[in-house]
C-alpha cells in the first residue's frame, strides 16, 4: 500500500505557547495573559496561541491516515527546538516533505519513521514537531493498510506482547490546582495533579512554605473526598526548577526540603518533577544525581522526576545510566518520531528507571490518541492525560481511547 497524496493544514493546539524563562523571571498576570516582554527567541509575547500542523495521508485504497505536528507549551526552553508556527512550516512541508511522502510504501512503520527522523534538509534535522506528526500519520497508515490497531503495529514491529491492560493516567491541573483536584478525585484519577508550580513568589514560597501547605491540603482533600479507602492515588507535582532557586542550587538543602514534604502527603506516594534547572544537561544530571543520593541517605520515600534537559532519546539514556533520578518524563513531542518514545520507554523499563510517558497540554486529540496506542504497547509506569488544561476533556480522549483499544485487543486473544 502506498501514499497517494499528502496534505498539510494549519490548526490550533489545545493550549498555548508560553515563554518559560520570562515566567521564571517574574512575568506578571493580566487575566489569562502574561505581562512583560518575552525573552526566548521566536516569541512575540510571553503567552501566544498554540498551533499545530495536521498531516493527512491519502492511501491508494482511499483510507486517510492522520497525525498532528505539535510542540510543547514551553517551546524553546531547556534545550528544546524553537517555537513551532504553522505559517513557517507548511511551505517547507509542501516543498520538501510532500514529494518524499507521495508514492511511499506504508506496509511497515519503522523504516519510514526512521527515514524522516534522520532526514536532513540543508544540513538540518526536521523540527521535532514535524517528525512527531509525520510519524503519527505513518503509524496510522501502516495500521490502516494492514487492518491492525496502531498498538498492534508497534507490538508486532518491536516483537512485544500485546497486553490488554490499562496504563495509570496522570491528570494535570494547570493553574486551577484546587478545583481541578476535586474533579480528579471524583473521577478516580491514578496520579495527580501536576499543579504547575512555576513561580517562587506566588506558588512555591521563598522558603517553600506555599508548596508545603498545598501538599498538605492536597492529601487532606483526597482523604476527605474519596469514596473508598481503596482510592490511593500518587501525588506528582511539577516545580519547574523553582526549588533550586530558593535553596541556591544546593543539592543537600534541596533534598532536605523535598524529603520534608513526605509527611504532608500522609502516606500517599509523592513525586517531585524538575526540582532544579541547572541550565545545561551535564550540570542537570550532576545536580539531580546529588539530590537523589541525598534523598536515599535520608531514607526518604519521595521520588524525583527528570524533565528539563532530558528531551531526546539519548538524553533519556544518559539520565538513566547516571541513576540521576527515580523517574524520567518522556516528553513525547520532544523526541521527534514516535518510535523514539517506544525505544525510550523500553530502555527505562530494562534499566530500572521508572518511565513517565508525558507530553504537553499543547498537543491535539490526534496526537493524544496515538500516544495511548504507544503506551499500551511499550508499557510506561504512567501516561499523561492530554491535551488541554481542562482535565475533563483530556481524560475523555485518553481514557476512552485506552478502554476502546483494550476491548478490541481482548477480542483477539
Swiss-Prot record:
Biological processes per GO annotation: glutamate catabolic process via L-citramalate
Site for Transition state stabilizer, residues: 194
Keywords of this entry: Lyase, Magnesium, Metal-binding
Catalyzed chemical reaction(s): (2S,3S)-3-methyl-L-aspartate = mesaconate + NH4(+)
Pfam families noted in UniProt: MAAL_C, MAAL_N
Active site per UniProt: 331 (proton acceptor)
Molecular function (Gene Ontology), one example: metal ion binding
Cofactor: Mg(2+)
Metal-binding keyword on record: yes
Domain of life, source organism: Bacteria
CDD domains: MAL
Presence of keyword Manganese: no
EC number: 4.3.1.2
Pathway assigned to this chain's UniProt record: Amino-acid degradation; L-glutamate degradation via mesaconate pathway; acetate and pyruvate from L-glutamate: step 2/4
SUPFAM superfamilies on file: Enolase C-terminal domain-like, Enolase N-terminal domain-like
Residues engaged in binding Mg(2+): 238, 273, 307
Protein family according to the UniProt entry: Belongs to the methylaspartate ammonia-lyase family.
Reported function: Involved in the methylaspartate cycle. Catalyzes the formation of the alpha,beta-unsaturated bond by the reversible anti elimination of ammonia from L-threo-beta-methylaspartate (L-threo-(2S,3S)-3-methylaspartate) to give mesaconate.
Subunit structure of this chain's protein: Homodimer.
Protein name: Methylaspartate ammonia-lyase
Organism per entry: Citrobacter amalonaticus
